[in-house]
Amino acid sequence: MNEKKQSRLRRAKSTRLHIRALGATRLCVNRTPRHIYAQVISADGGKVLAQASTLDTSLRSGTTGNVEAATKVGALIAERAKAAGVTKVAFDRSGFKYHGRIKALADAAREGGLEF
C-alpha cells in the first residue's frame, strides 16, 4: 500500500476513535474518482440510518465525479437524515482532506439542516 493511502487510513482511524468516544451519530463520506458516497451511521456503529450517493437514480444521469455532484449528494443526505429523525451528526471525512468535493458535500449538508 502506498504511503499516501496509509496516511489517509491512519487519519480515518484516529477520527473514528474520537467520534466513537463522543458517542455521536456520524456522517461518513467516501469518494472515488468517479463517485461520492455518504452514510449516516448510528452512534453504536451498527446501523445505517440514511445513505445517498451519485449512484442513486436521481443523480446518476449527470456527471458524478465533481463538486456539483457532491453538492447534490450533500443536500440529499441531509433530507434523508432529517426524515430518519437525525439532525446532529459528527462529520467523518474518512481521512480525506476537507477540500473540494468533501467540503462541497459538508456545506450542502449543513445548508440542508444537519448540525455538525
UniProtKB/Swiss-Prot annotation:
Presence of keyword Cytoplasm: no
Record GO biological process: translation
CDD domains reported in the protein's UniProt record: Ribosomal_L18_L5e
GO molecular function: 5S rRNA binding; structural constituent of ribosome
Keyword list, A-Z: Ribonucleoprotein, Ribosomal protein, RNA-binding, rRNA-binding
GO cellular component, one term: cytosolic large ribosomal subunit
InterPro entries linked: Ribosomal_uL18_bac-type, Ribosomal_uL18_bac/euk
Coiled coil: none
Superkingdom: Bacteria
Presence of the UniProt keyword Ribonucleoprotein in the record: yes
Family matches, as NCBIfam families: L18_bact
HAMAP family to which the protein is assigned, alphabetical: Ribosomal_uL18_B
Subunit comment: Part of the 50S ribosomal subunit; part of the 5S rRNA/L5/L18/L25 subcomplex. Contacts the 5S and 23S rRNAs.
Family, similarity comment: Belongs to the universal ribosomal protein uL18 family.
Function per UniProt: This is one of the proteins that bind and probably mediate the attachment of the 5S RNA into the large ribosomal subunit, where it forms part of the central protuberance.
Descriptive protein name: Large ribosomal subunit protein uL18
Organism this protein belongs to: Acinetobacter baylyi (strain ATCC 33305 / BD413 / ADP1)
The encoding gene: rplR
